[in-house]
Amino acid sequence: MRLLRRRHMSLRLAMLGSVFMLFLFIRQKDVSNQEQAMEKPWLKSLAGQKDQVLDFMLGAVNNIRDVMPKLQIRAPEPPQTLVSTNHSCLPGFYTPAELKPFWDRPPQDPNSPGADGKAFQKKEWTNLETKEKEEGYKKHCFNAFASDRISLQRSLGPDTRPPECVDQKFRRCPPLPTTSVIIVFHNEAWSTLLRTVYSVLHTSPAILLKEIILVDDASTDEHLKERLEQYVQQLQIVRVVRQRERKGLITARLLGASVAQAEVLTFLDAHCECFHGWLEPLLARIAEDKTAVVSPDIVTIDLNTFQFSRPVQRGKAHSRGNFDWSLTFGWEMLPEHEKQRRKDETYPIKSPTFAGGLFSISKAYFEHIGTYDNQMEIWGGENVEMSFRVWQCGGQLEIIPCSVVGHVFRTKSPHTFPKGTSVIARNQVRLAEVWMDDYKKIFYRRNLQAAKMVQENNFGDISERLRLREQLRCHNFSWYLHNVYPEMFVPDLNPTFYGAIKNLGTNQCLDVGENNRGGKPLIMYVCHNLGGNQYFEYTSQRDLRHNIGKQLCLHASGSTLGLRSCQFVGKNSRVPKDEEWELTQDQLIRNSGSGTCLTSQDKKPAMAPCNPRDPYQLWLFV
């Protein structure tokens, strides 16, 4: 075959030479002797087809090139660069000029109250000022007096984020999406609300900030009505939309989302301040992955002094969101595997749940996964519901450490619930029934109010949410526990005994007391049948747990009964003898380590030598 190719090679070269000479002849005739060409029809026809002849000649050249013997080793060719099909963006990275904030911050007085994020300080108070401060605390549950005296446009000082965050660059292709910032408020203090708005305007790139939507959840304070409407007119991209009756955070956010015009929805609370470069990392992550629901690193604005906790360059101990089996959101330190996965501070933190107050999400994805459960009422449980839904239905929750936003964390809510706090239990029942499968039993044992709602079928229609779960082909809750939150301790689905532990001698119940997170003495208290501080489980591992929230175990030390974090946490752990208990047939509760039994002495729980004839050593789960 190779010999045949070589014999034909000279013939092909001769043919190519003839074609080339003919083409030159035609070009010469075409240019220098138009009249002669017109006199000879055959030449006129060939000259008119000169472009086709040229194409034929080039094709012949390519054909011969393809059959020429190739070198077996040639210089490496650089890989082809895939050019973006998005012609509306340029290659490379955004420049600082392109990411210029919507508004420049006005000149700052470094000695003004709270300047550069410092604490508000005041040494001497008049009676009138003291009264104003106390009224502010009563109404808002933070120091509104201090907030009112801090500039609405205060600076937060220099950018103290880690160097990799400060130096982070953002690609133009795909372009960073635009965002609508949605802020829900109800009778919010004037200064905290507007400082939140100004903070967004002074830190968000103009090309990315489409609008700020203030959603009023039926505020009654006069300053939040016409005065606010008139004030925001000067802020250009800020507008107010209103709910005429109090419906709560969930429906207010849905209202804001329904009128938002940008590609991404960014939700903030009404008492926040945004740090340098907070927005770009959130939007960049969504540009990479539309299913990412991203939260900033939320730092504290002190509720008393309004001091902003600025980020540090090194050594930040990050937290992530979690939940307990009463379906309460909380924070925990990162597990070791998550620390190892992250190479530097630009890497997102995977989080099993999120606080839900401050986050960004693609508007299209928000709608795809079912927005919020619009049958949930007011506030409570919506963040845990959305956490389960996002993870189980193919998305992911992440915290972006390079994005820093301050938040005033209050110790209690200043607002009343139109239907009382039962709305929280109702919301939690809805999320448990839709997303938790059989694991919902664990929750109902800890919340008797919720369990009663289920028995009475008093939590609304969930058929639409169940249909959503089916349509999205979501994972079950077991998948979530194994793949998203394997560190979560799962109590027995069907514990041996659970409920309150009643002493037959005193007719009182064992009680952990108020705010006992372990280390405090237990007490005896009137049995109230409400669970809570009197809820215990006797497990298949034979430990006695008080595990409404944190997993706490009874342990015996001499004659003392104690409460501490359970030593058995699942695989590769065991129950120590001083946490192991035997519930005997004659109603004693005997500790395996000490051999002593639980008793009530002087109306206090204690340990004593076992005596089945002593009524103060007899106990019953009720």
UniProtKB/Swiss-Prot annotation:
Glycosylation (residues): N86, N476
Disulfide bonds: C509-C527, C553-C566, C597-C610
Region (Catalytic subdomain A): 176-285
Cofactor (UniProt): Mn(2+)
Keywords: Disulfide bond, Glycoprotein, Glycosyltransferase, Golgi apparatus, Lectin, Manganese, Membrane, Metal-binding, Signal-anchor, Transferase, Transmembrane, Transmembrane helix
GO biological process, one term: protein O-linked glycosylation via threonine
GO cellular component: Golgi membrane; perinuclear region of cytoplasm
EC numbers: 2.4.1.41
Main location: Golgi
InterPro entries registered for this protein in UniProt: GalNAc-T (IPR045885), Glyco_trans_2-like (IPR001173), Nucleotide-diphossugar_trans (IPR029044), Ricin_B-like_lectins (IPR035992), Ricin_B_lectin (IPR000772)
Cytoplasmic side: 1-8
Annotated UDP-N-acetyl-alpha-D-galactosamine binding sites: D511, E514, H528, N533
Gene3D superfamilies: 2.80.10.50, Spore Coat Polysaccharide Biosynthesis Protein SpsA, Chain A
Listed transmembrane segments: 9-28
Top-level taxonomic group: Eukaryota
Pathway: Protein modification; protein glycosylation
Pfam families hit by this protein: Glycos_transf_2, Ricin_B_lectin
Annotated function: Catalyzes the initial reaction in O-linked oligosaccharide biosynthesis, the transfer of an N-acetyl-D-galactosamine residue to a serine or threonine residue on the protein receptor. May participate in synthesis of oncofetal fibronectin. Has activity toward Muc1a, Muc2, EA2 and fibronectin peptides.
The protein's name: Polypeptide N-acetylgalactosaminyltransferase 6
